[in-house]
Amino acid sequence: MQLRLATYNVEWFDALFDEQGYLQRDTVWSRRHNITRAQQIKALGTVVRRIDADAIMVVEAPDTSRQRNGVRALQRFAQVMGIRARKAQIGFVNDTQQEIILLYDPDVLHVRHAPRSDPDAPRFDGSLLIDLDVNETKEEVRFSKPPLEVE
């Protein structure tokens, strides 16, 4: 089986959705220079449709917060824009507004979040004790931007 995979870092994608995760297709300026939100949404839809990937890793996807669900927001985007990669999978949520979410075609793939860990490498929703400044004292490091691990 041959798969078509893509990665797309969409600058300011988050700003194209309201707090409930609905697209804001209007004439208000987007955060991109000299382009409206409607123009940016249309352009993104065109690009993603033409890529026509079985799965596309979206970097800087709509964030997930108490008000918004990034997975639902991306699935709405795919539905509105007629993109066959219409189901979304997120891993560990972060609070940096730079989520990584996989959009995929459920007719081709079955995807689930599958984080791994071992004693020397904790899961990315945990913390790591490591001597960062070589002072023989371990500091706790929390991961601010966890990768998305899927299978």
Residue map of PLM features:
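N-terminal, active-site-proximal structural segment of metallo-dependent hydrolase catalytic domains
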Residues: 1-99, 136
